[in-house]
């Protein structure tokens, strides 16, 4: 059985993230979406809300589960009994940053990283941008899963 971890803060999860999850779920027997908590950062949505939003948005993926973690991604990956990370790439800048992280993860723990090119229709989408546009009254419904869009609209009223 092969498994992979899709790590991130997912504050909130976007359709771009879900696209990466779906593609990972098609390639691996098991996918764990790891919501990594940084205690120094205050997100718009708390951990329980993020877990619920991802679970609702990925209910159609039976081989995917959502877990919370903190610390090094590779420690989380190993604790899950896995040795692969899947990351979505939107731009060349993403690649430069993620390549360094992938090389470090391989060096310190033998964990491989698989990159998935984001679907072009989501290449500009980020959680931060979606939140900013929503807070200014813009429509981000085409960028977010419906359960997320609903919660974001409620939060930014």
Curated annotation (Swiss-Prot):
Keywords: ATP-binding, Coenzyme A biosynthesis, Cytoplasm, Magnesium, Nucleotide-binding, Nucleotidyltransferase, Transferase
Function: Reversibly transfers an adenylyl group from ATP to 4'-phosphopantetheine, yielding dephospho-CoA (dPCoA) and pyrophosphate.
Family statement drawn from the similarity comment of this UniProt entry: Belongs to the bacterial CoaD family.
Assembly description: Homohexamer.
Biological process, per Gene Ontology: coenzyme A biosynthetic process
Catalytic reaction list: (R)-4'-phosphopantetheine + ATP + H(+) = 3'-dephospho-CoA + diphosphate
Gene3D superfamilies cross-referenced by the UniProt entry: HUPs
Localization terms from the record: Cytoplasm
Named cofactor requirement(s): Mg(2+)
Organism from which the protein derives: Mycobacterium marinum (strain ATCC BAA-535 / M)
CC per GO annotation: cytoplasm
Positions contributing to ATP binding: 9-10, 17, 88-90, 98, 122-128
Name recorded for this polypeptide: Phosphopantetheine adenylyltransferase
NCBIfam families (alphabetical): coaD_prev_kdtB, cyt_tran_rel
Protein's UniProt keywords contain Thylakoid: no
